[in-house]
A protein has these predicted regions:
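N-terminal strand-loop-strand
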Residues: 1-35
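Active-site-adjacent beta-strand/loop module that shapes the phosphate/pyrophosphate-binding cleft
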Residues: 3, 13-15, 72-98, 109, ...
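Residues that flank catalytic or metal-binding motifs in active/ligand-binding sites
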Residues: 5, 32, 83-85, 104
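Functional cleft and adjacent loop/helix regions within the main domain
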Residues: 33, 43, 103-105, 113, ...
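The catalytic Nudix box helix
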Residues: 36-69
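A generic structural signal for short hydrophobic patches within well-formed alpha-helices
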Residues: 41, 116-117
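Short, charged, solvent-exposed linker or helix-capping segments at domain edges/interfaces
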Residues: 96-102, 119-123
Length: 140
């Protein structure tokens, strides 16, 4: 398996996206911005397991790998650093209702996809990666 830094999840429920607002701490990347579930790799886990473990830690949701319908590895934004992954999947209303938000972040919500893509306080490279996925859907 190729080394990677971490993985994020774009989880859709109808036309909305599961997002959370990052803590406002100067020592973390993208403080206060709207972000997607996910985070850094631990040990030798696969990209899928990394994303799903982070989802469980951050939102209390347990999904199986077969719920991920799309994935792509993206080069790092910083030269010399490892790449990261974006996966896409769907959530049901029942799963949304069962969310138990963890202790990282200021809060979560289901944000309309179009709003996330245009939001001035969303993590910019995740907006671009979500656009990449959506363009694949239109072309596919």
């Amino acid at each position: 398996m190729q080394p990677f830094n971490g993985a994020k999840l774009a989880l859709l429920c109808d036309d909305a996206l599961l997002v959370y607002q990052r803590d406002v701490k100067p020592e973390i990347p993208w403080p206060g911005l709207w972000d997607l579930p996910g985070g850094g790799r631990e040990d030798d886990e696969s990209p899928e397991r990394c994303a799903l473990r982070e989802l469980q830690e951050e939102f209390g949701l347990v999904l199986e790998e077969d719920r991920l319908t799309w994935g792509r590895c993206y080069p790092s934004l910083q030269p010399g650093c490892l790449p990261s992954w974006l996966f896409v999947g769907r959530l049901s209303c029942v799963e949304i209702a069962s969310i138990r938000f963890g202790d990282e972040g200021r809060g979560w919500l289901l944000m309309p996809v179009a709003e996330f893509l245009a939001h001035p306080q969303a993590v910019p490279h995740l907006q671009e990666r979500l656009r990449d996925y959506l363009s694949q859907c239109v072309q596919g």
